[in-house]
């Protein structure tokens, strides 16, 4: 197989990487616990849980929002398929909203126009370091008693 790209790994991480690999705690343990604490400090929120992937995190968020077969989730087509696949995996229907032609982000007015009795959640994607209009979307969601799920993989550390 020809690799599409080679991951760069500086020699300075070798010792620490080997220490983690040989600890037996690859998916959980001291380093993950410390990372979650540091991340919580960074965000000012102690309730941090790391997941193996962004897709896994979105699957969990959809479960917590009680999204199931026959429900609708408003999302954007301007994203990686990994954002929308968990919606289908939950048995729900993806309802795409329009995107703002300047930012490429979900248009809050379009989101509101797509809401039906079956709408259970809004899946926002903060993209390219630009956060969506959270304030407006949260206002819409509250008005219609709909959960908001945010995919921030492309805007980590951005502020609104």
Language model features with spans:
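N-terminal "arm"/small-domain region of PLP-dependent enzymes with the aminotransferase-like
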Residues: 1-25, 30
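Conserved donor-binding loops in enzymes that form glycosidic bonds
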Residues: 6-7, 98, 127
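Glycine-/small-residue-rich active-site loops that bind phosphorylated ligands and cofactors
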Residues: 9, 27, 79, 102-103, ...
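Generic structural signal for small/hydrophobic residues in well-ordered secondary structure
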Residues: 17, 39, 57, 73, ...
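Solvent-exposed, non-membrane alpha-helical residues enriched in polar/charged side chains
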Residues: 18, 22, 36-40, 59, ...
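Phosphate-binding glycine-rich loop
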Residues: 25-72, 86-89, 96-98
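Conserved coil-to-alpha-helix start sites within the AMP-binding
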Residues: 78-84
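Active-site phosphate-binding strand-loop segment of PLP-dependent enzymes
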Residues: 102-160
